[in-house]
Amino acid sequence: MVRRLWRRIAGWLAACVAILCAFPLHAATAGPGAWSSQQTWAADSVNGGNLTGYFYWPASQPTTPNGKRALVLVLHGCVQTASGDVIDNANGAGFNWKSVADQYGAVILAPNATGNVYSNHCWDYANASPSRTAGHVGVLLDLVNRFVTNSQYAIDPNQVYVAGLSSGGGMTMVLGCIAPDIFAGIGINAGPPPGTTTAQIGYVPSGFTATTAANKCNAWAGSNAGKFSTQIAGAVWGTSDYTVAQAYGPMDAAAMRLVYGGNFTQGSQVSISGGGTNTPYTDSNGKVRTHEISVSGMAHAWPAGTGGDNTNYVDATHINYPVFVMDYWVKNNLRAGSGTGQAGSAPTGLAVTATTSTSVSLSWNAVANASSYGVYRNGSKVGSATATAYTDSGLIAGTTYSYTVTAVDPTAGESQPSAAVSATTKSAFTCTATTASNYAHVQAGRAHDSGGIAYANGSNQSMGLDNLFYTSTLAQTAAGYYIVGNCP
């Protein structure tokens, strides 16, 4: 009796433990789900005044397994303000961060640049000697620390990110370089790299390369450079941007790869809704570390996407970068343990659906979030498809090929290949069948006589007596090769 009771208690305890393990022990405190009123934060003794701005604390719960919130610092560009351009305003949803914050349960910070740097309320990205304790870098790091250390926001210090436009894009890269221990991911929008001056925003100076920027970045990181091993980055720019040199976009990402060190593999280009094309890069461990997005036809602007502002260097007609970059950060975060580091599962169910003498048709099962699929023949990519089917043409007749398929995720790149399938193209010869007497077959060269018996040429199959009274059907399946019967 007692033994049975203890068994029941043990069962109840096991069930309770299983339930508790499936959910965070404490739900994150729900915020108001609205942008705050203007806040006043640390004083900037270098540029003057106090850092002011806004924050968004969502009512939704965080989506990460540890139940902690991500924190995103968003930096406006020159001649912009947080209230007029970044947060929701009379023109729309600003930079369009609110809906993304609700989706992921993330806290968003939108500060105003202190002082009047470069006479246009810019961020001081071109400071040749930035300090973690002074100027714009100092007050921004102080702001991040205020939220990370305030338990009511439940911020995960391993999920702190920064993104910005123009001078804010340049400052994004500065922060990523000088504080890689703070920022797990950065998103640079039309930002000049470290080591450039304000006079060089529109062109790449002679001799300036990604290595130049990487050397600056490493120097600023100092003793924190080891944290680059778990940081991820990306850059986005418009092909009609004539304010900041378009060449700085891929250069920014290349510089960060140099800082991260090791070998990188360029992935397949992936289309993003709104005219964007992303090129992901993976490290030697197969982890996605950088993205490079060019946006066709976009001028110098923050790519807010549908619903965002469409004025004063904010673009609502092209890609939604907040949606892209937040998904990119969450999927590929190397610190929080919540990201996969690469795209989703490889396609399953790859099968050969048809063959001809010059083509092979394939089909496979769809993969969630895949925007396209890569098709590989004998290990080399031969094409891509947005549907779950593909026909590979221009092949050699009577040849066997091996195929695999990958899934391409817009934010994380290409998956591992699927299981391989083999396909053999059909012979180029068109089979024909002839019915005649065995004697006629022998006389026509379709068969031969041996000891009064007719045999089909090639297969040497017996047809019976070689005379006018025995009739056979022979099918020519290849040049000089006949079988008894009709074409297969």
UniProtKB/Swiss-Prot annotation:
A GO molecular-function annotation: poly(3-hydroxybutyrate) depolymerase activity
Catalytic activity, reaction form: [(3R)-hydroxybutanoate](n) + H2O = [(3R)-hydroxybutanoate](n-2) + (3R)-hydroxybutanoate dimer + H(+); [(3R)-hydroxybutanoate](n) + H2O = [(3R)-hydroxybutanoate](n-3) + (3R)-hydroxybutanoate trimer + H(+); [(3R)-hydroxybutanoate](n) + H2O = [(3R)-hydroxybutanoate](n-1) + (R)-3-hydroxybutanoate + H(+); [(3R)-hydroxybutanoate](n) + H2O = [(3R)-hydroxybutanoate](n-5) + (3R)-hydroxybutanoate pentamer + H(+)
Subcellular location field: Secreted
Biological process terms in GO annotation: lipid catabolic process
Residues annotated as the enzyme's active site: 166
Chief subcellular location: secreted
GO cellular component: extracellular region
Highest taxon of source: Bacteria
CDD domains in the record: FN3
Residue ranges of domain Fibronectin type-III in the record: 346-428
Keywords: Hydrolase, Lipid degradation, Lipid metabolism, Secreted, Signal
Enzyme's top EC category: hydrolase
Family: Belongs to the AB hydrolase superfamily. Lipase family.
Record's function text: This protein degrades water-insoluble and water-soluble PHB to monomeric D(-)-3-hydroxybutyrate.
Protein name: Poly(3-hydroxybutyrate) depolymerase
Organism name: Ralstonia pickettii
